[in-house]
A protein has these predicted regions:
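N-terminal signal-anchor module of multipass membrane proteins
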Residues: 2-51, 114-120
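Cytosolic juxtamembrane amphipathic/interface segments immediately preceding
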Residues: 7-19, 153-157, 238-245, 313-316
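Membrane-interface segments at the starts/ends of alpha-helical transmembrane spans
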Residues: 14-19, 110-125, 198-210, 243, ...
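Long, contiguous internal "core" modules enriched in hydrophobic/ aromatic residues
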Residues: 25, 84-93, 98-107, 208-210, ...
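Hydrophobic alpha-helical membrane-insertion segments
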Residues: 30-37, 165-182, 329-338
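Transmembrane-helix bundle segments that line or gate the permeation/cavity pathway
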Residues: 41-60, 129-238, 255
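Low-complexity, proline/glycine-enriched hydrophobic segments characteristic of transmembrane helices
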Residues: 42-120
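Alpha-helical transmembrane segments and their immediate interhelical/interface regions
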Residues: 120-152, 284-306
């Protein structure tokens, strides 16, 4: 540790996007934007069709049950002079009309018609952001736990997971944007208090204020730790010595503990609470397993890609075997937790 891990040539190695790769990336982004627009258009068209069909169903129900309305009108006219009798008959007519209209199967009447096209688009953005957050957090945990374990083999590929968790600030911006449309996604916000006994028992935890505060704390600490580990890692390579290593060791040890708590609560807040009526005692571990499996797969793909482009020549077959072992292990662990779930 008295000297730098890499040669000066390796320290100055920088990945540069070729024009071909840049065009592919821009092309994929363009295709993604087009698909989003097409999906929004189709969802909007589907909503309009649903509204039309709902109106037709309502008309058909009235046409198929004219007796109900006739009886209601006759009873109302016959009992016009007797208030109590008219009210009773009118109540029976309303009850019969509700049964004919199918309130129970209609999702509670006219107040709820399912997700709109706007909700679908926002949910797609929300889930996409979640996907990349889990990969970035898997990479951050990978660096921290290997620093705590003083593992030397990952030094050769450390810059790749560091680049992966560099996405966290952008993910935080996406998370902040998600706060603006929480009422379009989370059922525990959509359903008013007092209408669902089970959700009411969870409102001490599941409430917008607590959700936002926890999210800000989690992302703030994660980004701070990521930036500190990245900076200390760079200094360690350029300056050598043990000072920066020991600092990163202490930070990593504390972060591993914080990660276990914060990431479990994050999984409950951002994923599990989408279905507030569902119970799980291992969902945090299940999410962690999937996050690590995805991060290891992404890390392996990126390292192999960089080697094919002529970078990271110091990465050998032993490193590749370690990647494969990690990916296999966490995939099995994820599958085991899925079966247990």
């Amino acid at each position: 540790m008295a000297s730098s891990h890499f040669t000066p040539e390796q320290l100055t190695e920088r990945f540069e996007l070729s024009s071909r790769i840049r065009n592919i990336v821009y092309g994929l982004v363009g295709v993604g934007v087009i698909l989003v627009l097409i999906g929004a258009f189709l969802a909007q068209s589907g909503d309009g069709h649903h509204d039309d069909s709902h109106g037709e169903e309502h008309a058909e129900l009235i046409t198929e049950n004219p007796t109900i309305h006739t009886v209601a009108n006759d009873q109302h006219e016959d009992g016009h002079g007797e208030d109590s009798h008219a009210d009773e008959d009118h109540g029976h007519a309303d009850s019969a009309h509700s049964e004919a209209h199918g309130d129970d199967g209609h999702g509670g009447g006219h107040g709820h018609h399912g997700p709109t096209w706007v909700t679908r688009v926002l949910t797609g953005f929300y889930m996409s952001n979640l996907y990349f957050i889990t990969i970035a957090m898997g990479a951050l945990f990978f660096i921290a736990v290997h620093r705590v374990g003083n593992a030397g083999w990952q030094t050769a590929i450390r810059r790749v997971p560091e680049a992966m968790f560099g996405w966290l600030p952008f993910a935080a911006v996406g998370a902040l944007a998600s706060f603006l449309f929480m009422d379009q996604i989370f059922e525990w916000i959509i359903i008013p208090e007092g209408q669902d006994a089970l959700i009411d028992t969870k409102r001490a935890y599941l409430n917008p204020t607590g959700f936002i505060i926890r999210s800000i704390i989690f992302f703030g600490v994660w980004i701070l730790v990521a930036r500190m580990l990245r900076r200390l890692s760079t200094r360690e390579d350029t300056l050598g010595g043990l000072q920066n290593f020991e600092k990163s060791l202490g930070i990593s040890a504390g972060f591993v503990v914080f990660f276990a708590i914060s990431y479990s609560l994050f999984a409950i807040d951002w994923i599990k609470s989408l279905e507030p009526h569902w119970f799980s005692t291992i969902f945090g571990v299940y999410t962690f397993a999937g996050s690590m499996a995805s991060a290891m797969a992404t890390l392996t793909i990126l390292v192999y890609f960089l080697r094919r482009q002529g970078y990271m020549k110091y990465v050998n077959d032993s490193h590749a075997q370690d990647f494969n072992t990690y990916m296999l292990g966490f995939s099995i662990f994820w599958a085991y937790m899925w079966v247990s779930q």
